[in-house]
């Protein structure tokens, strides 16, 4: 049997925290070492459980949830999401603007597949949640990384972002609160990124999955509240704030 070779599309796709890093951790465990895995945001192994009302509602609704739902997700869930963001001062969002997926990661991949043509560029923070880089490259685009300055509390370097915008740039990814640094961005910083999107007609992709996990009186500012005049795509979910990483719809 001839060797089965993986697609060339995967040459620029790397997901170290679930690949090489995880394999090395398994190797060390096999040698008898105790490894504390912090490679992914999975709260369950550390004893954090989903709220009782979520568990109860899942059990109660299982008998009536055995078929396909609408392609965008359950109407009632999308309505609840609209109401949630209205409570945060984000208006003008319709139920038809809401898409529910099997976690934010699936929706990130779908967004990159739907947007990027060959050699289109996506500005992504460094360091980043590696799925963003992998998804952009897998879609045929090119992940271009901008610097998050360690000496400036991990905030994005606006001048570095400016220098990397090209005619091929389609959007800017903002991860706030940031994964992996934990930095929570100021309203002023978010406004600066929005202004770049405005000037260059770019889409803002705002990954806010950790928006409720805040420390030291930090306050999260949702990007969509500040960006009425540009297309802002917000990614969020139940996995982190509600400890429901294993719950899929």
What are these regions (language model features)?
Residues 97, 114-136:
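Conserved PLP-anchoring active-site segment centered on the Schiff-base-forming lysine
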Residues 144, 149-218:
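Active-site phosphate-binding strand-loop segment of PLP-dependent enzymes
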Residues 92-98, 118-121, 168, 229-232:
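Short acidic capping loops at alpha-helix termini that bridge into adjacent secondary structure
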Residues 226-249:
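Active-site PLP attachment segment
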Residues 137-144:
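A short helix-loop-beta submotif of the ANL/AMP-binding
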């Amino acid at each position: 049997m001839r060797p089965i070779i993986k697609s060339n599309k995967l040459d620029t796709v790397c997901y170290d925290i679930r690949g090489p890093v995880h394999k090395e951790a398994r190797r060390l465990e096999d040698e008898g070492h105790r490894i504390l895995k912090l490679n992914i945001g999975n709260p369950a192994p550390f004893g954090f459980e989903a709220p009782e009302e979520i568990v109860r509602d899942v059990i109660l609704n299982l008998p009536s949830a055995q078929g396909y739902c609408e392609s965008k997700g359950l109407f009632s869930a999308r309505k609840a999401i609209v109401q949630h963001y209205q409570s945060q001062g984000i208006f003008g969002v319709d139920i038809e603007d809401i898409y529910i997926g099997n976690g934010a990661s699936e929706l990130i991949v779908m967004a990159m597949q739907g947007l990027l043509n060959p050699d289109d560029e996506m500005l992504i923070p460094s360091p980043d949640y590696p799925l963003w880089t992998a998804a952009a490259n897998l879609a045929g685009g090119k992940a271009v990384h901008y610097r998050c300055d360690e000496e400036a509390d991990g905030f994005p370097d606006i001048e570095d972002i400016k220098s990397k915008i090209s005619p091929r740039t389609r959007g800017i990814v903002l991860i706030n609160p940031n994964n992996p640094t934990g930095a929570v961005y100021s309203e002023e910083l978010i406004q600066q990124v929005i202004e770049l999107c405005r000037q260059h007609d770019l889409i803002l992709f705002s990954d806010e999955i950790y928006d409720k996990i805040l420390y030291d009186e930090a306050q999260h500012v949702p990007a969509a509240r500040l960006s009425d005049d540009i297309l802002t795509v917000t990614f969020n979910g139940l996995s982190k704030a509600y400890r429901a990483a294993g719950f899929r719809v």
